[in-house]
Regions:
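Cofactor-pocket helix-loop regions in the catalytic cores of large enzyme subunits
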Residues: 1-176
Length: 176
């Protein structure tokens, strides 16, 4: 035990193994769905790391990134940099979620939606933004078709908010 203790650079498994135990890791939040999405969309088997420090607009759909989501300390550092005045400007943060949280408290706007409706609001926003673009990418027709059912009215009804709130958020994102 003395040799194990004096070498503080031993990995936990080696240190615990020297004591006759085994390492058990437990994580209260399962990140496998996020990893699976990264594999499917980007071909990368890793958790994302977001650089909030360079953001001008942050819209979070239920991701409580300042409290429990992925790397809260890293996210808090970047958010503080983006949300503090930089060259006379600061990032705007909108939190779309059913409950007020630490992330929501730090938002410039909280859009309180019904639980489980965050994705519908995001899809309605994507539909609205894409349909109002004057110069959409050439291959946007398939995406337009997929999003056409997700109107601000449909999402607003499911989310328990006004459709105009969704439109206003889209206008702000586009800088109108």
């Amino acid at each position: 035990l003395g040799d194990v203790y004096k070498d503080s650079l031993l990995p936990p498994a080696d240190w615990v193994g020297a004591l006759g135990g085994r390492v058990v890791r437990w994580q209260p939040f399962d990140h496998e769905p996020i990893r699976a999405a990264g594999r499917q969309v980007f071909g990368i088997d890793a958790l994302p790391s977001h650089d909030f420090s360079r953001a001008r607009q942050i819209v979070s759909f239920g991701a409580d990134f300042l409290e429990t989501w992925l790397s809260p300390i890293e996210n808090q550092r970047g958010f503080a940099e983006a949300h503090g005045f930089r060259n006379g400007q600061m990032a705007r943060h909108v939190f779309v979620a059913p409950r007020m949280s630490l992330t929501g408290l730090n938002a410039d706007q909280w859009l309180g939606v019904a639980p489980g409706s965050e994705a519908l609001v995001a899809l309605a926003m994507a539909n609205l933004i894409l349909s109002e673009r004057t110069s959409a990418p050439a291959d946007a027709n398939a995406l337009r078709s997929s999003l056409s059912a997700y109107t601000p009215e449909m999402a607003a009804q499911a989310a328990g908010v006004e459709a105009e709130e969704i439109r206003r958020l889209c206008r702000h994102l586009r800088g109108i």
